[in-house]
Regions:
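A contiguous, low-structure linker/loop signature
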Residues: 1-26
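Active-site loop segments of alpha/beta catalytic cores
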Residues: 7-8, 30-260
């Protein structure tokens, strides 16, 4: 919606810069009549009409501010720019955040007829809400996170209610203390990623989140669906865990339904 190129050949959507723009020359603004804005709103309207209240239609995934910046100028160029042109990076991020809020307002107007809101995280809110994130943060230091990311997240938590931060991968854990300093942040969704130990290995992370007065979301794996119960026993609180099952997982489903 802000001008990046799309690649869907892998079955997923990946974003790339449109050419090789200089950050100082790049200015962004949300256009509600942009081809992709119009298309996504048309899809949402069709879903609203077709399902007629039996399905809740959510916000598109708008992404994180620095993640969007990386898709517009390129990850490597953005990394160098944080060192060589920090004020231009902040100026671009300011513009992206304004556009982000404008997009939220635009889609909120369309979706408010449902009486509540949701996004890709599948949680319900009476007011507009959206998972906040910065996957780019795995490549920057704690000091740079405070300089380029934290204030935007703080504003997000003040503007929107029930905000959950998507903390993605062990490389991002160094920013947890700063995230927990956000007074109005509601919860942290810890995604430990592939190829690393699952939820039970991260008890200290969940405890730290709870001790800061935040809720936590466990991204569960189908191989061990009861692991969430073990985490709850040790950490406490009421985590949210989403488990995607197929028809072939009937044995696991029956165990869950009969579990006490």
């Amino acid at each position: 919606m802000l001008g990046a190129k799309l690649d869907t050949s892998s079955g997923r959507v990946w974003f790339f810069p449109n050419g090789d723009p200089e950050i100082s020359e790049l200015h962004v603004k949300y256009d509600p009549n942009n081809m992709w804005s119009t298309r996504m709103k048309a899809i949402a309207r069709t879903a609203l009409d077709y399902f007629d209240g039996s399905v809740l239609v959510g916000f598109p995934d708008f992404g994180g501010i620095l993640d969007i910046a990386a898709s517009l100028v390129g990850t490597e160029k953005l990394l160098f720019a944080t060192l060589e042109e920090p004020e231009e990076v902040k100026r671009l991020c300011d513009e992206i955040q304004v556009a982000w809020y404008d997009a939220m307002d635009d889609f909120s107007e369309l979706l408010k007829c449902q009486g509540c809101f949701t996004d890709w995280n599948n949680l319900l809110s009476k007011t507009p809400t959206h998972v906040i994130q910065c996957d780019f943060s795995t490549m920057i230091s704690r000091e740079m996170f405070r300089e380029f990311v934290l204030d935007y997240l703080r504003l997000d938590t003040k503007k929107l209610e029930h905000e959950i931060y998507h903390l993605d991968g062990p490389g991002a854990l160094m920013h947890l203390d700063d995230l927990l300093s956000l007074e109005k942040l509601s919860a942290v969704q810890w995604v430990y990623g592939a190829g690393v130990p699952t939820a039970a290995h991260w008890i200290d992370v969940y405890k730290k989140i709870r001790e800061a007065g935040k809720q936590y979301q466990i991204k569960q794996v189908v191989e061990d669906p009861f692991e969430v119960y073990e985490v709850m026993k040790k950490v406490g609180g009421t985590p949210y865990s989403q488990l995607n099952l197929r028809k072939s997982d009937s044995d696991i489903m029956n165990k869950i339904l009969s579990h006490k």
